[in-house]
Structures are given as C-alpha cells and as structure tokens.
Design a protein with these regions (language model features):
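Polytopic alpha-helical membrane-helix bundles and their juxtamembrane interface segments
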Residues: 1-136
Length: 136
C-alpha cells in the first residue's frame, strides 16, 4: 500500500509540475500590462513546496519505516490539500467569470471581467482534474 501511495504521489506531482510550468509561463510570476493572476505566487509555491517536502518525507518513511515520519507527511498533506482546494476554487470561479465575459463581449476566453488575461486560465481542465483525483 505504501508503494501505491508513492506512485500516486509521483503522478500527482507530475500533473502539478505541468500546471506550475503552464501558470508561470503564461504570466503567473510577472505582472505586465494585460496579464495577471488571481493565484498569489506565495500560495502556489507554498502548495508546491509543502507537497514536495511531503513526498520526500514519505520516501524517507519508506526507507526508515518511521511511523512518526508517516504522520508528519500526512499532516503536511492536509495543509497541501487545503491550499489546493483554495486555488482550484479560485481557478473554477475565474473560469466561469471568463466564459461569461467572453460570451457577453466577444472578448478572449481567458480574460477576467476587466480584460486581464489570467495565467491560471491557460491551464487546461484535464490536468487539474487528474491532479485532484490522484491527490485523493
């Protein structure tokens, strides 16, 4: 069972790395005219960093068989999951608003109501859903 958890964690990390790269490459880290994000970089990188730390703890647990490390990794994952839920809720809310704005104005689909192109709206839906499924 521990190996299955490791495999799903690695798959989840792969989808997460893809989403992080897409978000960063589409303007998530820079604030230039016409682009932006509603996902603060500190939240994105805290989610990423804690998830990576939890994965490392889990690997160390597998090697040492320390029950304490398993519980610390679990507690870490609770925080990671909460941050992930906050971000996916914002992503979905912005996606609905962008679709409504595009339908009303004929503007770009990924823009918010003020016309700002949101970096997170360039992340396709399938990786977000699969990341969430494998995380559970």
């Amino acid at each position: 069972m521990e190996i299955a958890a490791l495999i799903t964690w690695i798959i989840t990390a792969g989808f997460g790395a893809f989403m992080l790269a897409r978000w960063a490459s589409r303007g998530g880290l820079r604030h230039t005219e016409g682009t932006g994000t509603h996902l603060p970089p500190y939240r994105v990188f805290t989610h990423f960093g804690l998830a990576a730390a939890g994965l490392v703890l889990w690997i160390i647990y597998l090697v040492t068989d320390s029950t304490l490390l398993a519980w610390i990794a679990f507690a870490d994952l609770v925080v990671v999951a909460i941050l992930g839920l906050v971000m996916v809720t914002q992503w979905a809310k912005d996606g609905r608003a962008a679709m409504a704005a595009a339908a009303a104005t004929g503007g770009p689909f990924r823009a918010d109501a003020s016309g700002v192109d949101l970096a997170e709206q360039h992340i396709p839906r399938p990786p977000v859903v699969l990341h969430g499924i494998f995380a559970v």
